Regions:
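His/Asp/Glu-enriched, well-ordered alpha-helical/loop segment
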Residues: 107, 251-255, 320-321, 327-413
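Divalent metal-dependent hydrolysis catalytic cores, especially in the metallo-beta-lactamase
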Residues: 118-143, 157-167, 214-227, 255, ...
Length: 462
């Protein structure tokens, strides 16, 4: 990666919203008022399936939701007998990268522009899969912040993004991008680059993230699977460092997500006050009890664990040390998620997209059901629960008057067959129709809308 060019490239990417202000966007938008008519509606607030429903959309918001057919004389988006659901939320993605057998060498051949351009493709695949909002938890050089800005400006299609920017962790830990590489090639990251080794460093790192335009903070208090270090589960941050990150983050209104596989790292993160545990592979009964007491969310990412376990069996796909760790995590993570559900831990949907190919996010629903979670509950994890984790339950997470018009549709009853969530045929985000397979929808030809205040810079997409 040509790091000398990085400041210039990032400056260019960050300027995208300014460019957008000088251009006339041409993307499709919903008319001033239209009605989405579907055979069934999943009520994510109650977990019940409702019958025939008409959803009135005014601009980017839902104006009314009523049973039955639409009134005469209104513009109708007719979805027949399809089931409508709220736009889905994936609480753990990495839109600026994707798994590949060359991923470890690519970072020395590609510059940050290569990753940023590819991210626009991954974002569109995610939106087409029905995910209208995502939490992007870690990138390499804040390129997901530039992607968020470009989507908000109407330059490229994609989900509403809440971005952490770079992750924060310790020297030699899972967040250290130089781990396993020569210092003269990779350098020695400091707090401005997300690497900390004291509470004072933590404050500087969080403040830098605020300056960079992040929407939340992601920390790495445990080892991980895909880095080239030896351990997947060792604790890599002290409680004092975690508490400092959380205190600084809360000063800026940020939530804190913690990547943690190991039991001790999970314990420290929960005591330190984080909002969510990502993965939680080796959590024990004490961890689950602590999480329930503290109200800490679990974002399970079962699909990622299964995928790395499968790829680890392919010779050469991962470095040997990575493959060994993947084989440890793969068989365990699904059972842990089921145990956490039965222990009463709060669960929000998240997949670790990029660890597996983008656009396959909905496979996680099937894996959660297989882990013993009720189907309605599983759908709620990607709607009301995830919205609560993001602290934006007033804006999205259910098909309710006043919220963003984020609506998707599948061809049948997902409560009876959860695999239908992998067959999304209709996607509307903030009143704009992006996908309409096999549906009767009038062409929409107006230019892209200016986001309302709750969707714009204050939300920052994440």
């Amino acid at each position: 990666m040509r790091t000398r060019r990085l400041p210039l490239v990032l400056a260019m990417l960050a300027a995208l919203p300014v460019v957008a202000a000088q251009e006339s966007t041409t993307g499709p938008v919903a008319p001033a008022i239209s009605v989405v008519h579907c055979g069934h509606l999943f009520d994510s607030e109650t977990g019940r399936m409702l019958g025939e429903t008409s959803i009135t959309v005014a601009g980017d918001r839902i104006k009314a939701v009523r049973p039955g057919a639409p009134e005469a004389g209104v513009k109708v988006i007719e979805l027949g007998n399809a089931t409508c659901l709220p736009g889905l939320i994936d609480s753990h993605v990495h839109l600026t990268m994707q798994t590949s057998p060359t991923q470890y060498s690519d970072q020395f051949r590609w510059n940050i522009s290569d990753y940023a351009i590819r991210s626009t493709v991954y974002a569109q695949r995610t939106l087409m899969a029905g995910f209208t909002t995502v939490r992007n938890v870690a990138d390499m050089a804040n390129e997901s912040i530039a992607l968020r800005n470009a989507i908000n400006a109407g330059i490229v299609p994609g989900p509403r993004i809440f971005s952490s920017g770079k992750a924060i962790g310790s020297t030699g830990g899972h967040a250290d991008p130089t781990d396993g590489y020569r210092m003269d090639l990779a350098g020695d990251p400091n707090p401005s680059g997300g690497i900390i080794n004291s509470p004072d460093d933590a404050w500087k790192a969080v403040r830098q993230h605020y300056k960079d335009g992040a929407d939340l903070i992601k920390i790495m208090p445990s080892g991980g699977v895909l880095d080239e270090s030896a351990s997947v589960d060792n604790a890599q941050m002290t409680i004092e460092e975690i508490k400092a990150v959380v205190a600084a983050a809360h000063d800026y209104g940020f939530t804190v997500a913690a990547h943690a596989h190991g039991a001790e790292a999970i314990r420290r993160a929960v005591i330190g006050g984080v909002d969510s545990i990502e993965h939680g592979t080796f959590m024990n009964d004490e961890d689950m009890k602590l999480m329930k007491e503290h109200g800490t969310w679990l974002v399970p990412t079962i699909i990622a664990g299964k995928y790395v376990g499968e790829m680890a069996e392919k010779p050469g796909y991962y470095p040997a040390q990575v493959a060994a760790k993947a084989k440890m995590v793969g068989p365990i993570i699904q059972g842990t998620a089921g145990n956490a559900y039965r222990a009463g831990v709060k669960i929000a949907f998240g997949t670790d997209a990029a660890v597996y190919p983008h656009g396959q996010n909905a496979k996680e629903f099937q894996y959660m059901v297989e882990a013993g979670m009720p189907t309605a509950f599983v759908l709620q994890t990607a709607t009301t629960h995830a919205a609560q984790l993001l602290k934006h339950e007033k804006d999205f997470g259910s098909v309710t008057a006043g919220k963003f018009a984020d609506i998707i549709a599948v061809p049948g009853d997902p409560l009876a067959d959860i695999t239908l969530m992998m067959k999304v045929e209709f996607v509307m985000k903030a009143g704009v129709v992006y996908k309409r397979d096999s549906m009767t929808v009038e062409p929409l030809t107006q230019s892209a809308p200016t986001p309302s205040k709750a969707q714009g810079d204050e939300l920052k997409g994440y």
